[in-house]
Swiss-Prot record:
Cofactor note as given: Binds 1 FAD. Binds 1 FMN.
Top-level taxon in the UniProt lineage: Eukaryota
Alphabetized PANTHER family for the sequence: BIFUNCTIONAL CYTOCHROME P450_NADPH--P450 REDUCTASE (PTHR19384:SF127), NITRIC OXIDE SYNTHASE-RELATED (PTHR19384)
Name of the protein: Self-sufficient cytochrome P450 monooxygenase CYP505AG1
Annotated FAD-binding FR-type domain residues: 680-909
Protein source organism: Oidiodendron maius (strain Zn)
EC supergroup of this enzyme: oxidoreductase
Flavodoxin-like domain location: 501-644
């Protein structure tokens, strides 16, 4: 025995029952799901005995890459695939390796699926695609569409019409599917199911066998009818059917027998439509459950194709659509596995023995999610990872949904073109929505997979009609511009030669996004047409590079790091060569807060420098907005007026008179029927519990528990974002100022600067409550507009002062809103449309989750500090929008939330037994640490030996806001955490709880802090900026030169490397909203 053989280890797997194999380990109705679930227990490889066959399952890229070597491994036809031979024998898909008829058919058919021939099929594909579009258009937006069913109809009709000249006319069969499809589904399902059952038991399944043979007979009869129809009606079509009938093998000179023709007709009718329809169904599932991806895909279609006829040239210019298809097939490959076998006895990975011909099933679902290839987020939907520049860098054999080598899918190019066309056509013509917003992905298994019970609704876009889909009316005017993925008429108010501008943002909290939309709103007044407003990550690899298209980027830093939707863009930007952007004009607007001095504007500055290094042309100096001392919207307006548009006007744009650039009014039609309900795209969740946490004497604090859908996952430290509703008090103020009843209906063309809404009809209450920021400080431009509609002598002088020298002290610093000014100066004659246009859209607010997902599955809790205080301006009260909204919730309320991962540094250490932790919080800043502690408690109860954890917690008083006291006492008794409280609002008898701030308590316990720090502790801080600064200052003293009991910290924070700091000391700073 060789040394190598000594290293061999057995392939793991469950125990095998005599005669039955692993039948009881598999759910025969959901075989694939069973195998995938089992695979999670065994790692990279395992084995089962099913249907009398020993099967080896591979789950990692490394092992799969090895078996893709065709000199060592070849296709093996066994199990479910082997059962298909009863219907199609040696067709292309089911032939054994080296089988003669496979070689003859393959050589005859190959030319039909060459690139030129595939392009020639586009007309036929569009013919069938039009039938789908007409069906959806005529049924209307309220019809519930079984999208997987309709895509099955489409792909069956497409393969039959384009390759055989035969029309199944599936869209004219009402709700029923063609008998061929029924037979095919039964055929595939039984082939799969019977493969898991021992042969001697299958012998007793007479009824199933009869149905199986009946399905085969039906499909062969249908195929023979198509064959005879062509023979009786000869055609000179250069298609698959004529190749099968008349082709000759260039190697042997042989033609194909009728038996072989029928085998391959069925093969193409089945394999040529079933996997494609599944792939398309998964594409639309992922697009509809990921609005940003849907927006990016639609924008690409609008930009490349517009509203015109789709051509083959268009399809070659859709990189994002290609990435979407690749990512859908990565996550859910519709042909979920291929089976290979060794040509000789060999080993895998140098340690697993496999015998010659032994079936090795390569499970694409897990291979395509290998974290060593795709990273820790391999299970997540991220089409950007499959853009060309990233896709081309993947290791070989990392993405194989079409199979391997010579036995790979011969019709891949056909399926790809068809998929591109269908996606582009549907996005071009329809707005799709989920029929059930809470739909959870279900998988229907035969030998292939597709989504089950997946229903959508389809509404024609941009006023298109079914007649236009038939080509009966004139083409839509080419005088269009694209905004936010919607096609809208070009702005008649633009002056000069309209120059395109792309506006990109990186934003976690929504502020930079709101600024981007405000800029988009302003651009037409300066002679620019906005082509898109999108996230930075959405343009990786497709950043506009034309010298006549301006790119404006608005972004910020989060503790020195990019926003979540800008991380991949920044990494990509660093890889660009000099002159890669070829003179692309650009400008950057930076947002920040000066309290983070070390990282102030760090990311915007980096982007500005990297763009210039890559050959882009800076047309204006970088704009800056410091939220600590100014209003960002005002800063943006100043930068626009003084730098951006004036600098870039040299390109040929005419500037616009200042008077013409004041706020644009819109017409609002007011009627009085009740409004329909307002819907948001976030996931609807149900409030399950609320209770007050604090007593009088401190800010009110509430505990809010939310029941989440099963597919909403989070980790301790992550965030929930909520789109709130404005306080009712403020809504009533706005209604009263414009003399509107709450149920008055506003027919609105747009809300603020969010872009075109298509004349939405909303109640006045909904508009003011759910769409706009009523408390946003007024900008100078807002005041200029108010001044222009104020009669002489009716406060004009005061308004002029407020818009001038007094702006910063009396408006910005006092946070005076437009609504405040309208109430203060009642003579202002502003229409409701102009008021709505002035206001930013209501933005999401983000809160730390105060629970562990493991503590109470499918639930998350929030810990809210309610902001309600006298307004700085002296006009009434200032109410935090989100905190008051959340505090008013009661069990049973439905609220729309999204999960936002925290920065990775704020997660708990992977190994709780290796790293101590120190948590520092004040007030509701305890939220993430409650989740940390719950998670640690569960680990301890599961036998994990925890390193020490200390929570320094600042409160006002023991009887006021000592949050979660009983719960924390129980955790402390278990040894999960040691809680050190600091009461800043009372004197107590206890020395350990004497009057102090949280940083004072840290100083008192500095010996333990130093001890844990020197043991590698990670420090987490959560609270307001003043508290965070105080904690950092005292911590710097603790770990600096000061000695305690002869011990001192390793080094001062100021001397620690940035890498060490980001890994070991991390803070989350919040503001009340």
């Amino acid at each position: 025995m060789t040394k190598k053989n000594h290293a061999l280890i057995p392939i793991p797997g469950p125990s095998v029952w005599p005669l039955l194999g692993n039948l009881f380990d598999i759910d025969t109705e959901h075989g694939l799901a069973s195998v995938l679930e089992m695979g999670r227990s065994y790692g990279d490889i395992f084995q089962l005995v099913l249907g009398g066959n020993k099967l080896v399952f591979l789950q990692t890229h490394a092992l799969f890459d090895e078996v893709c070597d065709e000199s060592r491994f070849c296709k093996v036809v066994v199990s479910g695939l082997g059962n298909l031979r009863a219907g199609v024998n040696d067709g292309l898909f089911t032939a054994h390796d080296g089988e003669h008829n496979w070689g003859v058919a393959h050589r005859i058919i190959m030319p039909i699926f060459g690139p030129i021939k595939i392009r020639e099929t586009l007309g036929g594909m569009k013919d069938v695609c039009q039938e789908l579009s007409l069906k959806w258009a005529r049924y209307g937006p309220d019809h519930r569409i079984d999208i997987a069913g309709d895509l099955t109809r489409l792909t069956l009709d497409t393969i039959a019409f384009c390759t055989m000249g035969y029309r199944f006319n599936s869209f004219y069969r009402n709700s029923d599917v063609h008998p061929f499809v029924k037979s095919m589904v039964g055929f595939l399902r039984e082939a799969d199911k019977s493969s898991m059952i021992p042969e001697y038991l299958n012998a007793f399944r007479w009824k199933a066998r009869r149905s199986f043979l009946g399905d085969i007979a039906s499909m062969r009869e249908m195929s023979m009818m198509i064959l005879n129809l062509r023979r009786g009606n000869p055609s000179d079509r250069d298609d698959l059917l004529n190749a099968l009938l008349h082709g000759r093998d260039p190697k042997t000179g042989e033609g194909m027998s009728d038996e072989s023709i029928i085998n391959n007709l069925i093969t193409f009718l089945v394999a040529g439509h079933e996997t494609t329809s599944g792939a398309l169904s998964f594409v639309f599932y992922y697009l509809l459950t990921n609005p940003e991806s849907l927006k990016n895909a639609r924008e690409e279609v609008d930009r490349v194709i517009g509203a015109g006829n789709i051509t083959a040239d268009h399809l070659s210019k859709l990189p994002y659509i290609d990435a979407v298809l690749r990512e859908a097939l990565r996550l859910n490959p519709t042909g979920p596995a291929i089976t290979l076998g060794a040509r000789e006895d060999t080993t895998l990975g140098g340690k697993y023995a496999v015998k010659k011909g032994e079936p090795v099933l390569c499970m694409f679902h897990n291979i395509h999610r290998d974290k060593k290839v795709y990273g820790e987020d391999a299970d997540e939907w991220k089409p950007e990872r499959m853009m060309d520049e990233n896709f081309n860098k993947l290791p070989k054999n990392a993405w194989k949904p079409f199979g391997n080598g010579t036995r790979g899918c011969i019709g891949r190019a056909f399926a790809w073109q068809e998929s591109q066309l269908v996606i582009a056509s549907i996005l071009q013509n329809f707005d799709l929505t989920l029929d059930n917003p809470d739909y959870k992905l279900e998988i229907v298994e035969t030998l292939t997979i597709k989504p089950g019970n997946f229903y959508v609704r389809a509404k024609l876009r941009s006023g298109r009609t079914p007649r236009e889909l038939c080509g009966f009316s004139n083409p839509i005017s080419t005088n269009i511009q694209i905004k936010n993925g919607t096609i809208a008429p070009a702005n008649d108010g633009q002056v000069g030669n309209s120059t395109p501008v792309t506006i990109l943002y990186g934003s976690n909290s929504g502020t930079c996004e709101a600024l981007a939309h405000r800029l988009a709103r302003d651009a037409p007044s300066y002679g620019y047409s906005v082509t898109t407003v999108a996230t930075l990550d959405s343009v990786i690899g497709i950043l506009p590079r034309a010298k006549d298209e301006l790119v404006v980027i608005i972004t910020c830093s989060y503790d020195g790091l990019p926003a979540d939707n800008a991380v991949r863009f920044c990494n990509w930007l660093k890889t660009l060569d000099e002159d890669a952007l070829g003179g692309m004009p650009f400008a950057v607007f930076a947002c920040g807060h000066h309290d983070w001095a070390k990282t102030f504007y760090k990311v915007p500055i980096m982007i500005d420098e990297l763009l210039a290094r890559a050959g882009a042309h800076r047309v204006a100096q970088m704009g800056k907005a410091n939220s600590a001392v100014s209003d960002m919207f005002s800063d943006l307006e100043n930068w626009e007026d003084e730098h951006l548009w004036s600098s870039s006007s040299a390109a040929g744009n005419e500037t616009v008179d200042n008077v013409a650039r004041t706020e644009v009014k819109q017409d609002i039609t007011i009627t009085n029927p009740r409004a329909r309900a307002l819907h948001h795209n976030a996931v609807e969740c149900i409030v399950s519990e609320t209770h007050k946490l604090s007593e009088s004497g401190s800010a009110l604090k509430y505990h809010v528990e939310i029941q989440l859908p099963a597919n909403m996952k989070y980790a301790p430290g992550d965030h929930l974002s909520v789109l709130p509703i404005n306080p009712r008090q403020n809504v009533r103020r706005a209604l009263a100022r414009f003399h509107l009843a709450g149920d008055s209906v506003l027919s609105v063309a747009r809300i603020g600067h969010m872009g075109t809404l298509g004349q939405e009809t909303l109640s006045a209450f909904d508009v003011f409550a759910s769409y706009v920021e009523l408390s946003q400080p007024a900008t100078r431009r807002n005041i200029a507009t108010l001044l222009s509609v104020t009669p002489e002598g009716e406060g004009r002088y005061e308004l002029a002062e407020l818009g001038g020298a007094a702006f910063e002290s009396q408006i910005r610093d006092m946070r005076v809103s437009v609504l405040d000014l309208l109430e203060r100066y009642k003579a202002i004659k502003l229409c409701v449309g102009a008021f709505i246009d002035m206001l930013p859209p209501l933005r999401v607010r983000t809160y730390s989750i105060s629970s562990s997902a493991l503590w109470k599955p499918s639930h998350a809790s929030l810990t809210i500090s309610v902001l309600a205080q006298p307004a700085l301006s002296g006009q009434g009260s200032f109410l935090g929008v989100a905190s008051n909204f959340l505090a008013d919730l009661v069990p049973g309320d439905a609220v729309h939330f999204t999960i936002r991962p925290c920065k990775k540094q704020f997660h708990l250490p992977d190994d709780a037994s290796a790293h101590p932790i120190i948590m520092v919080a004040a007030g509701s800043g305890i939220a993430p640490f409650r989740g940390f502690i719950q998670d640690r408690a569960l680990q301890r109860r599961n036998g994990v030996q925890l390193q020490p954890a200390i929570l320094f917690f600042g409160c006002r008083g023991s009887k006021q806001d000592d949050l979660y006291r009983q719960e924390l006492d129980e955790f402390e008794a278990e040894g999960v955490v040691s809680v050190r409280r600091a009461f800043s609002g009372e004197e107590t008898v206890s020395i350990s709880e004497s009057r102090m701030y949280v940083q004072d308590r840290m100083w008192a316990d500095r010996a333990e802090v130093i001890q844990l720090w020197n043991l590698g502790a990670k420090i987490y801080v959560c609270g307001g900026i003043n508290m965070a600064d105080g904690v950092r200052e005292i911590f710097n003293e603790i770990v600096g030169p000061t000695e305690v009991d002869g011990k001192r910290g390793a080094e001062s924070l100021n001397k620690l490397s940035e890498e060490t700091m980001s890994a070991r000391y991390v803070a989350e700073i919040f503001s009340q909203t």
